[in-house]
Amino acid sequence: MIQVEEAYLNHLIYVSEHDVLTGVLNRYGLKKKIHELFNPDGEGYLCVVDIDDFKAINGACGHMTGDLVLKAFGQSLCGIRNSSVARLGGDEFFVFVDGIKEEEDIRKEIKALEDRVNAIEIPELGDIKITFSMGAHYFKGNIEEVKAIAYSKADKLCYESKKKEGNSVTIC
């Protein structure tokens, strides 16, 4: 009986920290993970990522296909080295990349992400290609800077990428 209760408790903890559709972290799980990983001398990148024209995908292909896109895209994001990935809502994701210091290294990770996304096969999409816009902001320092400043900057960078007709990455 104790094993059943423990398994149920572990399930409840998992569900409280993860997005049910995509399997990536939710906001609560991300906040907890960042606090677990972060140290005062930490550095890396905070990224905000949106799927381009996701509403059009839902409109043209239906919400079930949209759900498949979200799930596949979330799993593609999980391939970023040293990352914690969360779905913030809708088609917006947050990626905390720990320990990558050089812009060249984050660009390599983003290129690999583009390759993974291009390889997603969902027959219901037909000729529609999945593309994304991303803002990536380098951070160094304490958790308060990450929460207060870096997220805001990454979000603005993502918005700038979207204004460039999508399928774009802006790094700062």
Q: What do the predicted segments below correspond to?
A:
Residues I51-D52, I100:
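PAS/PAC or PAS-like capping segment
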Residues R107, H137-T170:
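Catalytic-core segments of nucleotide cyclases and related cyclic-nucleotide turnover enzymes
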Residues Y8-L25:
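Amphipathic HAMP/coiled-coil signal-transducing linker helices
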Residues E17, N26-Y45, D52-G79, A86-G90, ...:
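Conserved long alpha-helical elements within nucleotide-processing catalytic cores of c-di-GMP signaling
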Residues M1-E6:
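N-terminal membrane insertion elements
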Residues L46-V48, I171:
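Core hydrophobic beta-sheet residues of small sensory/regulatory alpha/beta domains
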Residues A72-K140:
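GGDEF/GGEEF active-site signature
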